[in-house]
């Protein structure tokens, strides 16, 4: 199995690659973790990971300038049905639009816009930086065996925006930060986390292992 982590100049690429390598090794899964900026490698991968940090529009633009990459993503994910995992802004790009600074069109895989967070408690700072627990809204294979809720494992967040999904069934998990914040979405063969699994220690490694086993 070959897992393509897309290198388009954004995301914690080194730490993401190492986290996927470690998760595969510890789970006893034979997987080649392929950090690549080559569309042909993405189009033929068994699983695809899209990291992303920074502004929505910048990440969208960065992906667009890699010739053939968006077409490769569409071929692998939409047409062939390969499992896809978006991380942070990589997850946000799954949305219809991003409303950060300007209106930017997303992939349209998860209906909804990426909007600024507005905590009810004014003492809560934006961005949210740090650890938070997850409220699982519905079962999903990527959370098999992972303790969630107040006494569950913690995930690591760094963000000022979140995906306001139009369909409740697309939201797998939320976090509380002065109100509900979308933490994980999934539809069909596509999944994405607002938090950083590569920085989320036990939760992150378990989530990645489940992704490597996932057969949507």
Curated annotation (Swiss-Prot):
What is annotated as the active site? Answer: 88, 196, 198
Question: Where does this polypeptide localize?
Answer: Cytoplasm
Which keywords, in A-to-Z order, does the entry hold? Amino-acid biosynthesis, Cytoplasm, Glutamine amidotransferase, Histidine biosynthesis, Hydrolase, Lyase
Q: Name one Pfam family in it.
A: GATase
Single GO MF annotation: lyase activity
What residue stretches are annotated with the Glutamine amidotransferase type-1 domain? 2-216
CDD domains reported in the protein's UniProt record: GATase1_IGP_Synthase
Q: Where is coiled-coil annotated? A: none
Gene Ontology CC: one annotated term: cytoplasm
What is its pathway?
Amino-acid biosynthesis; L-histidine biosynthesis; L-histidine from 5-phospho-alpha-D-ribose 1-diphosphate: step 5/9
Name of the protein in question: Imidazole glycerol phosphate synthase subunit HisH
């Amino acid at each position: 199995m070959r897992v393509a982590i897309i290198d388009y100049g954004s995301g914690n690429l080194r730490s993401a690659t190492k986290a996927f390598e470690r998760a595969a090794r510890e789970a006893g899964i034979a997987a080649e973790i392929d950090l690549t900026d080559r569309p042909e490698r993405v189009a033929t991968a068994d699983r695809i990971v899209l990291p992303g940090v920074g502004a929505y529009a910048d990440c969208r633009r960065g992906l667009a300038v890699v010739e053939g990459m968006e077409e490769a993503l569409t071929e692998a994910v939409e047409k062939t049905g390969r499992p896809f995992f978006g991380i942070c802004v990589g997850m946000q790009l799954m949305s219809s639009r991003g409303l950060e600074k300007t209106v930017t069109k997303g992939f349209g895989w998860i209906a909804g816009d990426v909007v600024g967070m507005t905590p009810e408690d004014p003492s809560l700072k934006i961005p949210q930086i740090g650890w938070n627990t997850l409220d699982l809204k519905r079962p999903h294979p990527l959370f098999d065996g992972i303790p969630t809720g107040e006494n569950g494992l913690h995930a690591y967040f760094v963000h000022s925006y979140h995906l306001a999904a139009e369909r409740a069934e697309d939201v797998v998990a939320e976090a509380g930060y002065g109100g509900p914040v979308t933490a994980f979405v999934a539809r069909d063969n596509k999944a994405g986390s607002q938090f950083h699994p590569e920085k989320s220690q036990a939760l992150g490694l378990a989530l990645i292992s489940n992704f490597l086993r996932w057969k949507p």
